[in-house]
Amino acid sequence: MAKGEIVTVKIEEMDFKGYGVGYCEGKPLKVRGGILGQRVAVRVKKGKKGRAEGEIVEVIERSPFEVESPCPHFGECGGCTYQNLSYENQLKIKKDVVLKLLEKEGIKDFEFLGIERSPKVYGYRNKMEYTFGTDREGKKALGLHRKGKFYDVVMTDKCNIVDEDFTKALSLTFNYALEKNLPFYDKKTHEGYLRYLVVRKASKNGELLINIVTTTQLKHKFDDLVELYRSANFSSTLVGVLHTYNDSWSDAVICEKLEVLYGRDYLIEELLGLKFKISAFSFFQTNSYGAERIYSTVREFAGDVSNKTIFDLYCGTGTIGIVMAPLARKVIGIELVEEAVFSAKENAALNGLENAVFIAGDVSKKLREIKEKPDIVVVDPPRSGVNPKALEDIVNFEPEKIIYVSCNPESFARDLRLFVDKGYAVKKVKAIDMFPHTYHVELVGLLEKS
């Protein structure tokens, strides 16, 4: 296969990043946007490490699994990958991807508990970051990036994976911006005022938080927009409207200064009967109902922990540790980001938990300073997986159980193999669909000392 060549392939499988995979001349060809069962003409591009990738030029034969997407933005918006597959087929693809990666790493003789459906298939997201910009025709837009494009924005005012209140906030804000003739930020010239609209909702608690992110290139009072929000017929309770100043050139929401225009700068969510304070910038799982399924699985895998010490590694804002603390003797959480540790301590206090301790620092370093020995270690690392030094230290503690929570099937399978090589056995694996209509899947694995 030469770069630029157009070849015809049948998509025979899906990979863990949502690419379709076909075979040409006996070699795999990754196809962005390809669907299992399709026959497509593909223009070859060279991918990383010599692996071939390609883009679809023409769909010659539709997939038998393909359905009409219920979302008018699908195909143009970069938010979803599987809107044109039935939900049952989405689940099957994710399950097959997980099992194939585990098989590749030689993980066997374990109980696979299948993939659990998301409790909500539509309207499940509790946070969205909308971008102010222009569409491919140069018209002003507020929404998500166009698929594969850095500068173009798609006006996603009919998105079906978000709550209706998000769409209402988006429309109100967009129309207000047009009426006031406020300049939208241009990422090419770094000029303009309005950058992002961030909306968060406590799905279980019904609280709504709206954050308008701008540069400092203009001075504008949003009093009338706040009144529009307050008088809007939201199904949620509006608890706060914020104004964040962000002059950074990076394409990310960075808080350089924060003003509370109305109410408070946080909302309260409830999971498994526990309360969590979520600020405008806190990390929190974006599917609250799905998060409960993950944490319930961690509890189930841990078993009776009434006399156990649990280490919660890469603990973030401490959600897993806080969920385990009411049942355990003691929980020790470690997280690199100091702001996240502050939130973890705050949430532990909010729930009256005195047996949960959270430490700021690098996991691989802090593990060597802790004198206590864990009975159970829970790891929920970043997508790259567990740091090799930290993995060695975890094994040296000789915990009776290791519970591995992951958002990346590839690093999950790789790290399970490393734990197996160091004397642990994989007992159970469960997949949980946190993000319907995307390729993402969450995993929980149970390992026990051999």
UniProtKB/Swiss-Prot annotation:
Q: Which SUPFAM superfamilies match?
A: Nucleic acid-binding proteins, S-adenosyl-L-methionine-dependent methyltransferases
Membrane-crossing ranges are: none
The enzyme's E.C. designation: 2.1.1.-
This protein's UniProt keywords: 4Fe-4S, Iron, Iron-sulfur, Metal-binding, Methyltransferase, S-adenosyl-L-methionine, Transferase
Q: Name one GO biological process term.
A: rRNA base methylation
**Residue ranges of domain TRAM in the record:** 1-58
Q: Does the keyword Nucleus apply?
A: no
Q: What residues does [4Fe-4S] cluster bind to?
A: C71, C77, C80, C159
What Pfam family does this protein match (any one)? TRAM
What positions constitute the catalytic site? C407
Q: Tell me which positions the record assigns to the signal sequence.
A: none
- Keyword Transmembrane helix in the entry? The reply is no
Q: Which PROSITE patterns does its entry note?
A: SAM_MT_RNA_M5U, TRAM, TRMA_1, TRMA_2
Q: What is this protein called?
A: Uncharacterized RNA methyltransferase TTE1797
Per the similarity annotation, which family is this? Belongs to the class I-like SAM-binding methyltransferase superfamily. RNA M5U methyltransferase family.
GO MF terms listed in the record are: 4 iron, 4 sulfur cluster binding; metal ion binding; rRNA (uridine-C5-)-methyltransferase activity
Entry-linked InterPro entries: MeTrfase_TrmA_AS (IPR030390), MeTrfase_TrmA_CS (IPR030391), NA-bd_OB-fold (IPR012340), SAM-dependent_MTases_sf (IPR029063), TRAM_dom (IPR002792), U5_MeTrfase_fam (IPR010280)
